[in-house]
Design a protein with these regions (language model features):
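Sec-dependent signal peptide recognition
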Residues: 2-8
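C-terminal motif of bacterial Sec signal peptides marking the signal peptidase cleavage site
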Residues: 14-16
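An exposed, glycine/acidic-rich loop-and-rim segment of catalytic or binding clefts
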Residues: 18-54, 58-296
Length: 296
């Protein structure tokens, strides 16, 4: 068996906190209980000692709500989500709200790749490409879920050889943890029995004003990146690495997200806004380094 990857993502909430004991959730657990592909779906709650609270469903291992305090100590749900499981299953509009993405995040051109001389055809769900794992990616399966304690959930999913066209039996183990340092930590670990490709990620949509409270255009973003990867008209990277200097892609100095989103710039037209990868500046190849900051 091949140990593919161990990935850890951190989100630090730096705000004034006051301890809260009652649930902040605005959704009902029973509205998230159904059966999908013979497996039960449910809703889980994570909390830390500072009052941060997160609700999660095992359908797609999705974050449904995430309550954090603003600078004045007022708690708001800062992720976009639905109030029942049916809206996730029979989605209209955005499919990936709060979800785990796999086997492969982002687009694979024409849904094709070659590995060790073998050609693989994936399911097409973003014509002409395969996006975020295909027609039935990890966002549309029920994960086996174990509540470790009040602030930690453990998920497991076994993806069969050939699922959505990908080679290898793949076992994915994932942990969501809400720490007392106000970090949301996502840990991925995957093991395969065959050479394959994999790119796991998390897909929450954040709004620091609170879900439903306007846009993020006035959120001030800093990206520690001198370059980005331009895309073609179907959002496949061209292979180039372009400087952000003098373009709307330059967030090295903190800038409101919406300041230049409507600029006459071809990359923004292709993406209908920002839908790109930035190449992060790094001092070393290992360890954590500052990637980005955002505040309202």
């Amino acid at each position: 068996m091949k140990n593919i990857s161990v990935l850890i993502f951190f989100i630090m909430i730096t705000s004034a906190c006051s301890k809260q004991t009652d649930s902040l959730s605005k959704v009902n657990r029973k509205d998230f209980q159904t059966v999908v592909d013979g497996k039960n779906t449910d809703l889980f709650i994570l909390k830390n000692k500072n009052g941060l609270e997160m609700t999660v469903t095992n359908y797609g291992a999705r974050v449904v709500e995430f309550f954090v305090p603003d600078r004045n100590g007022k708690f708001e749900d800062i992720v976009l989500g639905h109030d029942n499981i049916e809206k996730y299953i029979n989605f209209t509009g955005e499919r990936f709200l709060g979800a785990t993405i796999g086997r492969f995040g982002n687009r694979i051109a024409d849904g094709k790749f070659t590995l060790d001389g073998v050609n693989y055809q994936l399911t097409i769900n973003d014509a002409p490409n395969s996006l975020h794992g295909g027609e039935k990616g990890f966002d549309r399966v029920v994960w086996d879920t174990k509540q470790i304690d009040s602030h930690k959930l453990e998920f497991t999913y076994q993806s069969a050889d050939g699922e959505q066209g990908y080679p290898g039996n793949l076992v994915v183990e994932m942990v969501y943890e809400l720490t007392d340092d106000n970090e949301f930590i996502v840990t991925h670990h995957a093991v395969t029995d065959k050479r394959t490709v994999i790119n796991l990620t998390h897909h929450s949509f954040f709004n620091l004003h609170g879900a439903g409270n306007g846009t993020v255009n006035d959120h001030v973003l800093m990206l520690n990146a001198d370059k980005f990867t331009p895309v073609n008209e179907v959002l496949i990277p061209t292979g180039e690495q372009l400087s952000v200097e003098g373009t709307p892609m330059d967030f090295r100095t903190p800038t409101p997200i919406g300041n230049r989103v409507n600029d006459d710039y071809q990359q923004l037209k292709y993406g209908h806004g920002y839908d790109h990868n930035w190449i992060l500046n790094r001092e070393t190849s290992k360890g954590l380094e500052l990637a980005a900051t955002v505040y309202e």
